[in-house]
Amino acid sequence: DFGRGFYCTTIKKQAEFMAGRVVRRQGGIETVNTYELNEKIFEDKELNIKIFEGPSKEWAKFILNNRDREYKEITSKECNSDNKYDLVIGPVANDDIIVLFRTFTNGLIDIDTLIKELTYKELTDQYSFHTERALKYLKGV
């Protein structure tokens, strides 16, 4: 959703689901690690942190641009292909939401309808770390 990075969540059930999904797709052993995030990360003025409080036009465009392999404006603030953001926080676009995104990109609904529909879906959270500077604030528990 937010570009190539190390993804975490505050929701254990979501972490377990995603671990299972990775094992089904790639094989291996299902593993869920627990980390503690040092809150001082939000005081570090050298980090570029992007936070989406909930579904919004900006959030939807950001995810669409990160998932679009043909998106060329990687320096745009509307994507993170170049890891301009050290940390991005916001809702997860789950499989139901992906169907809505496709409906939008195919021109069958407008952006306002997309956002309205997203607010009725069960949303989860994700923290995506994109640089070593941001990762230093994570500690294994």
Name every feature range the model reports, one short phrase each.
Residues 1, 17, 21-141:
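Conserved NAD+-utilizing ADP-ribose enzyme module
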Residues 2-7:
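A short, exposed loop/beta-hairpin motif centered on an aromatic-Gly-Thr core
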